[in-house]
Amino acid sequence: MIPKLYIHLILSLLLLPLILAQDYYAILEIDKDATEKEIKSAYRQLSKKYHPDKNAGSEEAHQKFIEVGEAYDVLSDPEKKKIYDQFGADAVKNGGGGGGPGGPGAGGFHDPFDIFERMFQGGHGGPGGGFGQRQRQRGPMIKVQEKLSLKQFYSGSSIEFTLNLNDECDACHGSGSADGKLAQCPDCQGRGVIIQVLRMGIMTQQIQQMCGRCGGTGQIIKNECKTCHGKKVTKKNKFFHVDVPPGAPRNYMDTRVGEAEKGPDFDAGDLVIEFKEKDTENMGYRRRGDNLYRTEVLSAAEALYGGWQRTIEFLDENKPVKLSRPAHVVVSNGEVEVVKGFGMPKGSKGYGDLYIDYVVVMPKTFKSGQNMLKDEL
């Protein structure tokens, strides 16, 4: 796999003609005779527009943010602006401006996040680049399964269960620190990102990367909490109660927004409880949508002579299924009888139907006295 740094180098080479012809006025979308106030106003608008916190995951926006900062760094400095107006961006990048060694005038630029902090927070920005706080990530969605019998799906059910989930550590209040104090990350100076400056001949390219030491938080823990060992979270049992409505569909899901695992550095994700139907305990009924199906076996005598009746236990204990045939009424093998209103509940729309599939079991042989049946058939 090609390292990210090499990918950035390749992209930089491809963008070389564009970078060499950089127009700082065009980047800030202002005229060449723009006043200091207009330059500052343009920077304020564009830096907020392209700030990484508002464009998470967009490399293009991150690059725009760096370009806008670079343009403002030059045009807001009278000396740099004068050199740029006379000799172009290359002269500024190669040290045409004044300044001490390693400073902005020594062929380099201020960190774009430092510029942003000075503009919006008077140089006292906290972690996260000065644009409020970094966008809080959401924790992962957690999906759990519970199994219900067909009867529970029919009648509705109340389910209670407990899950062992991550939650903020009570001992350190989610700080991960025994004394509750966090130190500024020395690698990124609390910004959460590191700006790498690549110089290739006359070209200068700035690349923003998440700080590996602090994981982008801008802070590190020096004195770890003894309970959570600096993880900021501990496992806790959480109780849940779910009401499954009568007639709920198979694979019914109840979503609890923001009730999954949570921590101080992210918002809790969603908990999804999915209800599956058990393979057993269906009392001989099968479900397809809002309708129920059942197979009833008849003897040859019942099928041919009729005169029988059956009472079958139903999913509703107060509502038995009654089947019958008058005498001399034949039931064919594979015949289907529809019992209206004995399907699954449909809320205000009533009930589905029950389909009885009859299977006739014939004897292997007939007795001599049954030969008259052959003549009738």
Curated annotation (Swiss-Prot):
It comes from the Eukaryota. CDD domains: DnaJ, DnaJ_C, DnaJ_zf. A zinc finger (CR-type) spans 156-237. Keywords: Chaperone, Endoplasmic reticulum, Metal-binding, Protein transport, Repeat, Signal, Transport, Zinc, Zinc-finger. Residues 1-21 form the signal peptide. InterPro entries: DnaJ_C, DnaJ_domain, DnaJ_domain_CS, DNJA1/2-like, HSP40/DnaJ_pept-bd, HSP_DnaJ_Cys-rich_dom, HSP_DnaJ_Cys-rich_dom_sf, J_dom_sf. A motif (Prevents secretion from ER) lies at residues 374-377. GO terms for biological process: ERAD pathway; protein folding in endoplasmic reticulum; protein refolding; protein transport; response to unfolded protein. Residues 23-88 form the J domain. It is found in: Endoplasmic reticulum lumen. One of its GO terms (molecular function) is Hsp70 protein binding. A motif (Cell attachment site) lies at residues 288-290. GO terms for cellular component: cytoplasm; endoplasmic reticulum; endoplasmic reticulum lumen. The keyword Lyase does not apply. Pfam families: DnaJ, DnaJ_C, DnaJ_CXXCXGXG. SMART domains: DnaJ. CXXCXGXG motif repeats lie at residues 169-176, 185-192, 211-218, 225-232. Its main location: endoplasmic reticulum. Present with 8260 molecules/cell in log phase SD medium. Regulates protein folding in the endoplasmic reticulum lumen. Probably acts as a J-protein for the Hsp70-type chaperone KAR2 by stimulating its ATP-dependent reaction cycle and initiating folding reactions. Also involved in the endoplasmic reticulum-associated degradation (ERAD) process. Cooperates with KAR2 and another J-protein JEM1 to facilitate the export of ERAD substrates to the cytoplasm by maintaining them in a translocation-competent state and preventing their aggregation in the endoplasmic reticulum lumen. This is DnaJ-related protein SCJ1. It comes from Saccharomyces cerevisiae (strain ATCC 204508 / S288c) (Baker's yeast).
